[in-house]
Amino acid sequence: MAEKFTQHTGLVVPLDAANVDTDAIIPKQFLQKVTRTGFGAHLFNDWRFLDDQGQQPNPEFVLNFPEFKGASILLTRENFGCGSSREHAPWALTDYGFKVVIAPSFADIFYGNSFNNQLLPVTLSDAQVDEMFALVKANPGITFEVDLEAEVVKAGDKTYAFSIDAFRRHCMINGLDSIGLTLQHEDAIAAYENKQPAFMN
């Protein structure tokens, strides 16, 4: 079972860049591991750090600003997660501490991989995202409330509606990954297997 996602209130960090690809999210030299942990240290490595090893923070990159330390909601621009289809990208984002990414659009494969890893991709219009960027710029350190059950984001005095496929929404709210979904049908699977001839078991 994965962690359940119903509502989340978190600090918002604005990454004002379009077409952020998966190589920018987690560079290829850090992909050797097959477990989901440890990638957060290298999230946006080429932007966050001045050196390849990730030892010297870049003071001009937004994730390194003190007011955004501990951010769990990433606000960004269109076509986020484009490029190669590495699942390490949502792994790096969640390992860093992000629960939600808000953007006008996402690359299809990244979008699907996000749900598989309990990272909620929220799609809003360009105009709505523009409003949010202005709000965060005027109020650095602001928090947004994301309610998956009601499918709304509360930002300042405004509420923004979004839509998530019913099946994906159900899985996130109930903390169901592919294993969890299979276990929901464990009794039916066992009953089916018991009906098979002995040589098939």
From Swiss-Prot:
Pfam families: Aconitase_C. SUPFAM superfamilies: LeuD/IlvD-like (SSF52016). It catalyses: (2R,3S)-3-isopropylmalate = (2S)-2-isopropylmalate. GO terms for biological process: L-leucine biosynthetic process. Pathway: Amino-acid biosynthesis; L-leucine biosynthesis; L-leucine from 3-methyl-2-oxobutanoate: step 2/4. Its EC number is 4.2.1.33. Keywords: Amino-acid biosynthesis, Branched-chain amino acid biosynthesis, Leucine biosynthesis, Lyase. GO terms for cellular component: 3-isopropylmalate dehydratase complex. GO terms for molecular function: 3-isopropylmalate dehydratase activity. InterPro entries: 3-IsopropMal_deHydase_ssu, Aconitase/3IPM_dehydase_swvl, AconitaseA/IPMdHydase_ssu_swvl, IPMI_Swivel, LeuD. Catalyzes the isomerization between 2-isopropylmalate and 3-isopropylmalate, via the formation of 2-isopropylmaleate. Heterodimer of LeuC and LeuD. Belongs to the LeuD family. LeuD type 1 subfamily. This is 3-isopropylmalate dehydratase small subunit. It comes from Enterobacter sp. (strain 638).
